[in-house]
Design a protein with these regions (language model features):
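Terminal low-complexity tails and localization/encapsulation signals of metabolic enzymes
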Residues: 1-47, 80, 84
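Glycine-rich loop-to-alpha-helix module at the N-terminal edge of alpha/beta enzyme cores
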Residues: 45-104
């Protein structure tokens, strides 16, 4: 993939394009990867981790471990976290839209 000619080359924050999975706070790759392509052009946009059963199990276990701490938060604390996430989505809306539409 040549990022100079990719539709994703215009991202204001290239760090938003992740090709691994976030599991338990750690970016996890895989032994194999597969291409995500722009269906309009056939151009490869990125090579992403081809995760399997072990990674799925790790993600489920991490979510299970995180649940008690989330459950213990007050509605106000949860709301503040969700509002922070919403603000980040708004802040990066243009780049996120480019990433999402490039692979559609």
């Amino acid at each position: 993939m040549d990022m100079k000619t990719s539709p994703l080359a215009t991202l204001a924050d290239a760090a938003l394009l992740k090709t691994d999975a976030l599991i338990d706070g750690v970016w996890v790759g895989a032994a194999t990867r597969f291409a995500v392509t722009d269906p309009a052009t056939g151009q490869a946009l990125a090579q992403v981790a081809n995760l399997g059963d072990a990674e799925a199990e790790a993600a489920i276990a991490a979510a299970d471990r995180a649940w008690p701490a989330w459950r213990a938060k007050t509605a106000k604390e949860r709301g503040a976290i969700l509002m922070q996430w919403f603000r980040l989505l708004q802040q990066h809306a243009d780049d996120l839209a480019r990433i999402m539409t490039a692979e559609q």
